[in-house]
Amino acid sequence: MNIPHYSLETLAHLVQGELFGDEHFNLSGLASLEQAQSHHISFVNGEKYVEAAKQSKAGALIVTSAFKDQLPASQNYIVVKNPYLAFAQLTHVFEKKMTQRGIESTAKIHPSAMIADNAYIGHYVIIGAECVVGENTVILAHSFLGDNVEIGRDGFVESNVSLLQGTKIKDRVRIHANTVIGSEGFGFAPYQGKWHRIVQLGTVQIGHDVRIGSNCSIDRGALDDTIIEDGVIIDNLVQIAHNVRIGSNTAIAAKCGIAGSTVIGKNCILAGACGVVGHITITDNVTLTGMSMVTKSISEAGTYSSGTALMENNQWKRTIVRFRQLADVPLTQIMKRLDHIQTQIESLESTFKLRK
């Protein structure tokens, strides 16, 4: 297999960096500081990595000007303002891209479906009636597209993905293995001790430049659509219920669950294992730390927490006991005790001042 090589000059130009060293030096991959060899380029993304960079065998380093001044003058450098961003940009250069195009013989495609000539449809893919697959989009083996599904250009659908009836996906969207989009929402009407199923008549709309991880579920709406706006990134094992709306450029980490008809604003961050109840609104620019449970709307931007951090087990037990005891003490009584303690402290402070 021919491994592509890129000159240091070419890579510096791609990340709009300033080159120091041998401009013709060829590199064939990215690697960590610890594992890099002479044909690799690595990056320094913080003061704590400077010592590792001094010991690294990398052929070149991406650094800030401040870090460059702390490292050997003999090394090759690309100097940028944000090394981590430059690293992210170069991962696309060194990515092993899939160049295969066409439709595999085992794929089953409805005659009414429209597939771009330069798309790729993998083995045993099933594509239903009136579907549209855009230019340069890749759909890997065993994926399923129900009727009236649309995928824009430059998309990537990994193996065993199910895109159910009516799902609409725009350009440059990546969907990873075993994810299901457009499944039936969890809607039931309780009556006389039984649950009566509500048919989910909406669908799912996904904007441009969205990334959805593996084993996610995004349910279609009951009446209106479930909407994922442009630039949203979703980790693995995330559940998004019917009629949810996720604002543009929001990031959702693994194991989050968002209940039905909730609206999450733009540029939000949901750290791992957050839970969000249904029918609430979270404004723009909100960060929820790990394992937070959101039970009411959030109207002001900021960082919010409700998860309990790790502590030694015996300490945790004592804390839980005290926490339960708080519920049995009226708030007015707690306030009186605090006022009494404050009075005692002030009295002691006055006594010490007089003695001085």
Swiss-Prot record:
One of its GO terms (biological process) is lipid A biosynthetic process. One of its GO terms (molecular function) is N-acyltransferase activity. Pathway: Bacterial outer membrane biogenesis; LPS lipid A biosynthesis. It holds the Pfam family LpxD. It is an enzyme of class 2 (transferase). Belongs to the transferase hexapeptide repeat family. LpxD subfamily. This is UDP-3-O-acylglucosamine N-acyltransferase. It comes from Acinetobacter baylyi (strain ATCC 33305 / BD413 / ADP1).
